Amino acid sequence: MNKELSFEEGIEHLERIVRELEQKEVPLEQALNLFRQGIELVQKCNNQLDYAEKQMQILLENPNGELEVRPADFPVEG
């Protein structure tokens, strides 16, 4: 995977891999290679989601009843 894939491209590629693996005539070596690629894509997409979560902001009401924007405060693994 030389090219940086967007999240959506990664999911599409992962779906293609799953469809190909579901075919019964896939040789073992090819299936293992596809499985490895799929695992790499899942990790990449998870990292992209984690990054997006870090960038999100949550609109909250402060004690004065005013709305304020604060960074989301939830744990992100990575």
Curated annotation (Swiss-Prot):
InterPro entries documented for this protein: Exonuc_VII_S (IPR003761), Exonuc_VII_ssu_sf (IPR037004)
Subcellular location: Cytoplasm
Pfam families for this protein: Exonuc_VII_S (PF02609)
GO molecular function: exodeoxyribonuclease VII activity
Primary location class: cytoplasm
GO biological process assignments: DNA catabolic process
Gene3D superfamilies cross-referenced by the UniProt entry: Exonuclease VII, small subunit
Coiled coil spans: none
Function: Bidirectionally degrades single-stranded DNA into large acid-insoluble oligonucleotides, which are then degraded further into small acid-soluble oligonucleotides.
Family recorded in the similarity comment: Belongs to the XseB family.
HAMAP family found in the cross-reference section: Exonuc_7_S (MF_00337)
Record's subunit section: Heterooligomer composed of large and small subunits.
Protein's name in the database: Exodeoxyribonuclease 7 small subunit
